[in-house]
């Protein structure tokens, strides 16, 4: 797991850092798309959590949500090109630390990728116990990134 995280971090650092330096062609559209994607991921995470809290978790409900998280996780770093932070004049909770601390942001993104892939693997295997075990890592990766790189609601 540690080796996988280091590999994902290295690739994400190269791709994410290069992309983050490119200016956004339309900051408002980029922020809006980013926020819509995060809302979908939050809904997927809540749906999985709700299923696990129910008396009988439904894999047909969990699997597509876990797949969405895994699929979107690899794109997160690309959702923050330079010029889409508070300086863009667009309402966003993205903190300047995303761009001033690219290594930290890249590591947070890579941690999410690894956790989301583990959750998706557990869901694909139909292993409820493994899904239960994997979900907290996804939740921690989200919270860790939010604590550092997301500001309060306006």
Enumerate the language-model features and the residues they cover:
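Bacterial N-terminal signal peptides that target proteins for export
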Residues: 1-8
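Repetitive helical segments and hydrophobic/amphipathic motifs
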Residues: 11-12
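Sequence context surrounding c-type heme c attachment/ligation sites in exported
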Residues: 24, 28-60, 67, 72-154
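Sec/Tat signal peptide C-region and signal peptidase I cleavage site
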Residues: 16-20
């Amino acid at each position: 797991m540690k080796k996988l995280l280091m590999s994902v971090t290295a690739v994400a650092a190269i791709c994410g850092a290069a992309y983050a330096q490119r200016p956004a062609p339309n900051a408002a559209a980029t922020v809006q798309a980013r926020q819509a994607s995060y809302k979908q991921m939050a809904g997927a995470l809540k749906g999985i959590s709700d299923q696990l809290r129910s008396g009988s978790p439904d894999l047909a409900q969990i699997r597509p949500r876990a797949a969405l998280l895994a699929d979107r996780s690899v794109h997160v770093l690309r959702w923050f090109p330079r010029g889409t932070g508070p300086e863009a004049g667009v309402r966003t909770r993205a903190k300047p630390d995303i761009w001033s601390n690219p290594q930290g942001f890249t590591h947070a993104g890579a941690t999410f990728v690894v956790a989301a892939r583990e959750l998706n693997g557990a869901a694909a295997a139909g292993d409820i116990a493994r899904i239960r075990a994997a979900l907290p890592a996804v939740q921690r990766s989200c919270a860790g990134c939010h604590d550092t790189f997301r500001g309060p609601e306006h």
